[in-house]
Each structure stands twice: as C-alpha cells, then as structure tokens.
Amino acid sequence: LGGKELGYGSDLDLVFVYDDPDERAGEIYAALVRKLINWLTVKTGEGDLYEIDTALRPNGNSGLLVTSFESYAAYQQNRGSNTAWTWEHQAMTRARCVLGEHGLAQRFETVRAAVIRTERDGPGLRDEIVSMRKRVASAHPVRGDGFDVKHSPGAMVDIEFAVQFLVLSQGCRHPELLDNVGNIGLLERAQTCGLLPTPVGHAAADAYRQLRQLQHRARLNEEPTQVPQEQVTQARQAGLALWNAVFGAAVQKV
C-alpha cells in the first residue's frame, strides 16, 4: 500500500497516529481503529476485504495500537530511550500517509525524510539488513526445486532489501532516493546516479516487474508462487547480481 505496489491477496501494513491534545485521545482513537479493522477484515458471504497487519507500529504487537504523532516522530528519529529498529526504518522507505489532514501528512513526510537522510554506518547497516534477510528466509523456507518468486535467492525480497539498503545508506547524499516511487523507480534512480554498475539496476527493475507479474497471475488463479527455475533464469540472475553489487559475498550466507 505505502509503496504503491499492492498485489492480489496482499495484506495492509497500517500504522495509526493521531494529533489531538485531549487526554482521552489515545483511548478514543484506539476504539475507532479497532472498529475500522473489524470493518476491513470481517468475513462475509463474498469473502473478506483485506487482512490487516499492525505490527509495524512502535514496539510492534506489544505497543499501543495508536500513537501520538510526537511519540511516533521521536521513536522513528531515535530520540529518547525507546527508538526504532533498522527493520522499522526499512519499512519507512516504503511508508506513505494514506489518510488524514494535509498538515499531518506533511509532518509525516518531514519525519520520513529525516529518517532516510540520517547518515549511517554503512557496514553496520549492511550487516543488520543481511541478518534480517536471513531471518525472513528462515521464516519462509523454499521447499522443492522450484523458484519462489518472492522468497528464493534472487527473487523479490532480495531486490526489495537491496533497494532499502541503498535508500537508507545513500539517502543522505542522494535526495532523489527520498521519493517513494516504488522499487522499480528507485532502482532506475540508483542506476542513473551511479550507485549501481551498468546495467545492474535496469536489469533488476525488469526482473522485479516480471516476478511481480508472475505473482499476480498465480494469486489470481490461486496457484503456487513457485515456478520452474528455467522460466526465470534471467530474472534470478539479475536479482542475484543486484544483491552481489549491493551486499557482496553476504548473498552466499542467506
């Protein structure tokens, strides 16, 4: 939703913030949000509308369902003792305000830009993102000889993690990476500004587009998202080339 890359069957990762000085605001907005989630997820004779995931809120599922904007901004910008993890900043690269008054949306974009512009330790950031990729791989093992268009090495998750690393590590020097234009657009921009060797960025963008199409088709037809390796040889090689260009030999450890 945030990255404008919603697929068939995708859940919605939502974070709810409010800007209201009323002392009961948190309680009131939490009740409203619970009703909203119920409306969006209720099972009907025609199925359900969306699955909702609120785990990206500050402190995950152990945190408050709704957060004041000031608390959210402090959390994301690492002010105070309760601060965001790197994987939450990865999510911020794809975040977008989808509902709310214009002023609050602008304040959110300011916070998002500040997070992306933060200068970071490149090797440390790389290690954290590679470690998170390993955890995702452990949680979604690929069985059999097929190529899973999302989770196999060289597939969509590898491409997405590489893009997120580029945005977080280079956003302080390349403002063109701040715009939330989706993975394909960001790969093209990273290629244009010299962050990727020719033609790695363009090839990975084409691969991501192909893998997305395969995923859409499989979900519409209620089919598995694994395809024969030979069907996606070029796309897989492009995804692996991107990962190697960004993370180096760490790809072998995923």
Stretches with model-predicted labels:
Residues L1-V254:
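A nucleotide- and high-energy phosphate-metabolite-utilizing enzyme signature
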